[in-house]
């Protein structure tokens, strides 16, 4: 990497927390941040085995990385996660709020109170729980930034049975922009908005036939991959994006236009 690219896009010396980083898009983001030179905390909830394998993989490549578990729908466990990071680092430079899931497809009229609580807590409350506790650490960071994970569903209301999930991602859009104003000029806040990527998320919740249709309806005529998202996060966290805040970057092949 030449001097210009290193200065604008390198993350050497940065400390990053990626929630839900054991699999899928979160994993790809953690890999990209590590490759750019950041030291990365891989958060996991139920995927401890995958998290340990990722740590071993990145360490074998010369990366500085460790894993911490916790259920971020529980505010106390979110507090504990940040406390563990604070005990290791004196500050935090990058927070990626990636944890989230559709949980299950369901029409609104069939949504139980328990399912509603799980979907909203996992996709919205968790980001608030982690962020509010991490802000003091971020204030001690170097050009700190927060990256939230939204979804193309925030624009179109989601696919069949995903209305509540889509609403939580629309909340992430608004939360990102409001938080960007609230934390400026000290901390930048942006989001990325994936479309349909071939990860465990859509292998679990979307049929092969639906995936084929979505690919055909996407202007770039393919589905996304987890790896499509890491470079954008690296960019948003570096000096090259130092005048960007409150933005939601669409990484969905133009699906949000369709």
Description of each model-found segment:
Residues 2-7, 102-105, 156, 234, ...:
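Short C-terminal tail/terminal secondary-structure segment
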Residues 15, 22-23:
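Conserved glycine-rich cofactor-binding loop
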Residues 151:
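Residue(s) in the substrate-gating loop at a strand-loop-helix junction
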């Amino acid at each position: 990497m030449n001097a210009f690219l290193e200065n604008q896009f390198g993350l050497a010396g940065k400390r990053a927390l990626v929630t839900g980083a054991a699999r899928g898009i979160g994993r790809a983001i953690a890999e990209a941040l590590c490759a750019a030179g950041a030291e990365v905390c891989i958060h996991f909830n139920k995927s401890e085995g995958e998290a340990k394998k990722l740590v071993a993989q990145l360490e074998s490549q010369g990366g500085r990385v460790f894993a911490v578990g916790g259920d971020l729908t529980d505010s106390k466990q979110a507090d504990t996660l940040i406390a563990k990071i604070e005990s290791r680092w004196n500050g935090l430079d990058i927070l990626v709020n990636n944890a989230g899931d559709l949980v299950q497809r369901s029409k609104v009229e069939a949504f139980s109170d328990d399912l509603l609580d799980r979907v909203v807590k996992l996709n919205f409350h968790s980001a608030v729980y982690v962020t509010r506790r991490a802000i003091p650490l971020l204030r001690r960071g170097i050009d700190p930034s927060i990256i939230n994970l939204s979804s193309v569903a925030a624009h179109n209301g989601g696919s069949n049975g995903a209305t509540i999930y889509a609403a939580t991602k629309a909340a992430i859009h608004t939360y990102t922009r409001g938080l960007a104003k609230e934390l400026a000029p000290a901390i930048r806040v942006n989001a990325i908005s994936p479309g349909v990527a071939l990860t465990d998320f859509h292998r679990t919740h979307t049929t092969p036939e639906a995936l084929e249709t979505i690919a055909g309806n996407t202007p770039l005529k393919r589905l996304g991959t987890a790896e499509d998202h890491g470079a954008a996060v690296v960019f948003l966290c570096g000096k090259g994006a130092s005048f960007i805040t409150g933005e939601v970057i669409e990484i969905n092949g133009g699906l949000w236009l369709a």
